[in-house]
Amino acid sequence: MNAQFAMRTSQCIIMNYKLTIILLSLLLTSCGEYVRLQKSTDPEEKFQAGKNYFQEKKYTKSVTMFEEIVPYYRGTPQAEEVLYLLAESYMGQKDYYSASEYYQAYLRNFPRGTYAQEARYQVAYCYYLDSPDARLDQEATYDAINALSEFISVYPESNKVSECRKMLFEMEDKLAYKELLNSKLYCNLGLYGGNNYKACVTTAENALRDYPETKYRDDLVFIILKAKSKEASLSVAEKMKERYSEVIDEYYRYANAFPDGKHIKEANRILREAKNIVK
């Protein structure tokens, strides 16, 4: 029994060893072929290799092949495909910045090319994917909004329009949320270094104007009410009633728009406080 077990174990070890040798040989052959292609001076061979690597989803290698032959094929019938596949390879690598740059290069060179519609969509999608957290700089978000709007305008019948609209609303909501965060910050700063309550109100009002369909409308309208209430509570005596009257007006703006809003209890408390001052 022990002898049979030992024999089987030995056979497994030998099989694993052979398999390892085969895999290493294949890997070395593959690496050797890639190195050879890098050194090749034949652009057609590199073009075909790049397409093969792209089909195999070996995007790092396809990027290398295509980048090396872009200058050679410039002005030729193959230039369009080379440039587009290079952009697609960067997309496969999830290098959205580089991908967007090459998609745009494609559009500049081939505005009516075979892949023009897809390239324009991919530019917008790259910006969308590169859009950061709302707390960070939103340049990519603005770029995404512009590119998505442009795609919808240029290709209104495209089956991607619905998807683009969803991404567009998402990007606008992100900007609205950033303005909500800024409004909250101003409200919390209060009178530190100046009247930040006014800055809070202005920021929130601008967000409501710029993004009227945002899902943060409830929060934005409420932060205006809250800021005006806090400002009124810190007012000098001769201005207090006037400012609390504005608070009451602001309450009805909120309550009429959001009778079951998530801030309605706090809004009702603010109303009671305001009425006690104004009466």
List the predicted regions and their residue ranges.
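Sec-dependent bacterial lipoprotein signal peptides
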Residues: M1-Q4, R8-C31
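Acidic, polar-rich low-complexity tracts and alpha-helical solenoid repeat scaffolds
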Residues: L27, C31-K279
